Design a protein with these regions (language model features):
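Residue-level preference for the first positions of well-ordered beta-strands
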Residues: 40-42, 155-159, 189
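C-terminal lobe/lid and adjacent interdomain/linker elements of RecA-like ASCE P-loop ATPase modules
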Residues: 170-245
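ABC ATPase nucleotide-binding domain signature region
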Residues: 40-42, 52-119
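ATP-binding Walker
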Residues: 48-49
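Conserved ABC ATPase signature
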Residues: 99-107, 113-114, 119-151, 157-174
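N-terminal pre-Walker A segment at the start of P-loop NTPase domains
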Residues: 1-31
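The Walker A (P-loop) glycine that initiates the GxxxxGKT/S ATP-binding motif of P-loop NTPases
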Residues: 45
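Phosphate-binding P-loop
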Residues: 31-38, 149-153, 184
Length: 245
């Protein structure tokens, strides 16, 4: 197993979930067990597959709150995921890992609460990183924050929900390079929920597909997001005729 595997896997038994827990389609047929093989894992699926909720439940199980640092803080919006975390059995290497959990759709809220959410690296540098990110667009702010953490070479478990949100294709490529740096460094680990075929194309990542049948590995060529975009780009005019006729 490669270095940086802070989280080696997890098991989810929906029968153990707390009251009001989110119901994930991938748990429709009972418990699911996932072994993580690479320190860069991408969670992929259609809208409503439960990628965000799964990441948030994993954050709660690891006691990683949005923005990183401290204990997980439940909110009204996160309550279903927090209840689901009771159903998760973590397979960790040693102690429960420190980490960074970011949801792109709540980045502004996280930044607004930055005074209460210290980075794993605290002090003047950490506050400067928050200020820099706060002055940028949402997509660029997420990218700057991640860049500062990866450059610091801290050993962290990154739980990232759609970090490509708000980024142009060119900046998604920059994000891909950033994730590659994390992957090559080998000390940290990232689980990334994404719809981006650009991120999915990383040659060293593990792709996990979520649907009503569970959670399963798939090669890139079998991921609809990547396959359909490739088909469209090969012959846009033919694809448009089929779509619009």
């Amino acid at each position: 197993m490669p270095g940086g595997m802070l989280l080696r896997g997890f098991r989810i038994d929906p029968a153990r979930a707390g009251a009001g827990a989110a119901r994930l389609p991938c748990l429709a047929h009972g418990p699911v067990e996932v072994a993580l093989r690479q320190n860069l894992t991408l969670l992929v699926g259609e809208n409503g597959a439960g990628k965000t909720t799964l990441l948030e439940a994993l954050a709660a199980a690891c006691a990683i709150r949005p923005g990183g640092g401290g204990s997980y803080a439940e909110t009204e919006a996160s309550r279903p995921a927090t209840a689901l975390s009771a159903a998760i059995e973590l397979h960790v290497s040693g102690h429960r890992p420190k980490g960074l959990f970011l949801r792109a759709d709540r980045f502004a809220e996280t930044m607004a609460a930055s005074g209460r959410l210290p980075m794993p690296g605290t002090g003047a540098r950490g506050r400067a990183e928050w200020r820099l990110a706060d002055e940028q667009s949402r997509g660029e702010g997420v990218l700057s924050l991640l860049s500062a953490r990866v450059d610091a070479s801290e050993q962290l478990l990154y739980l990232l929900d759609e970090p490509e949100t708000g980024l142009s294709p060119q900046r998604q490529m920059a994000l891909l390079c950033l994730l590659d740096s994390l992957h090559r460094d080998g000390r940290s680990q990232a689980l990334v929920a994404t719809h981006s075929p650009i991120l999915m194309s990383h040659p060293g990542c593990d792709l996990l597909w979520l649907d009503q049948d569970g959670i399963a590995r798939r090669p890139l060529e079998e991921i609809p997001h990547w396959r359909d975009l490739r088909r469209f780009m090969r012959d846009p005019q033919q694809a448009l005729r089929r779509l619009l006729e």
